[in-house]
């Protein structure tokens, strides 16, 4: 363990199990570190991806690092809450409590710092065909306190995004000791392969869908 870092390395194993350890996220400036490098769902090699998490009294801080990046592929015409997920993004799915959620925040950021943020209504908890599945978009994220600062290091094959998400979105007034379910994802595509994507996840679902909430991992703020 190095200064300001609590290691929480988690290479996805293809299925969530009940005895998965609860990941502890500390107050800033310390952070928990999550890594993944396997595809969804077949667990083949995937570009190394890191997320660093910490919190303060008002905010969840996420630092996304997309490593081994070759393409930096995005649509420059897209704006807030457009379908940036069709290109290259890093994603966080977040809910409070330790039960499998039926509603949760879906946050995405692209290499050109465009964001997508919506509360997802998914009562089947696995996006079952024919079941309700809807999004309530956050239309003015910056005014609401959702911010991102993204930088590209193309010679190093990496892009990084520092994200702040207000805890008030989740009605959390006392964050220390609060319980959460989260999962983190990344999509990879290129001009040559679009619209096909390679998918990666912290805790990989058993099929190519990010919206299976039993695979969200348990987290507690300490």
From Swiss-Prot:
Glycans are attached at residues 113, 126. Its main location: secreted. It is found in: Secreted. GO terms for cellular component: extracellular region. SUPFAM superfamilies: CBD9-like. Coiled coil: none annotated. Residues 1-18 form the signal peptide. It comes from Arthroderma benhamiae (strain ATCC MYA-4681 / CBS 112371). Keywords: Glycoprotein, Secreted, Signal. Disulfide bonds: none annotated. The keyword Cell division does not apply. This is Extracellular protein ARB_03106.
